[in-house]
Amino acid sequence: MAKEFGRADRVAQQIQREIAVILQREVKDPRVGMVTVSDVELTRDLQHAKIFVTFFLNEVDDIEAGVKVLNDASGYIRILMGKAMKLRVVPEIRFVYDKTLVEGMRISNLVTNTVRDDQLRRGESPDQNEEDRD
């Protein structure tokens, strides 16, 4: 039976957990604010990790500043990660803003608006369909 997840996948999951804890407890820079680690992509040789993060900020400038702060602190974060994990080589890390949540919400709003507009064109009340389903 083949392994469902390779070593790189398992290490990436562990890195995600460790980085989340480090960002929560150790990184005190106010420019970072509330940050969530949404995913980690790790090369097969475990040398480089791309850390996808989301912020509870809406301003593009604040998000860019947060990513820059994280990338500037990546050496310190890497040292802390190396102490927490038992790896022969601790991967180089790079932080990237994860746009999937924002894009998903935007697409969801587009679909909702399109359905509502379609119902209004047909003369139906958008709330009427909700009542019919109950």
Swiss-Prot record:
- Which keywords appear in this protein's UniProt record, sorted alphabetically? Cytoplasm, Ribosome biogenesis
> What subunit structure does UniProt give?
Monomer. Binds 30S ribosomal subunits, but not 50S ribosomal subunits or 70S ribosomes.
GO cellular component entries: cytosol
Locations listed in the record = Cytoplasm
NCBIfam families given for it?
A: rbfA
Similarity-based family? Belongs to the RbfA family.
Q: Pfam families attached here?
A: RBFA
What does the record give as the organism's lineage? Bacteria, Pseudomonadati, Pseudomonadota, Gammaproteobacteria, Aeromonadales
The UniProt entry's GO biological process terms, in alphabetical order, are: maturation of SSU-rRNA
GO MF terms here are:
ribosomal small subunit binding
Matches recorded under InterPro entries: KH_dom-like_a/b, RbfA, RbfA_dom_sf, Ribosome-bd_factorA_CS
Record bears the keyword Repeat: no
Q: What does this protein do?
A: One of several proteins that assist in the late maturation steps of the functional core of the 30S ribosomal subunit. Associates with free 30S ribosomal subunits (but not with 30S subunits that are part of 70S ribosomes or polysomes). Required for efficient processing of 16S rRNA. May interact with the 5'-terminal helix region of 16S rRNA.
Give the protein name, as stated in the record. Ribosome-binding factor A
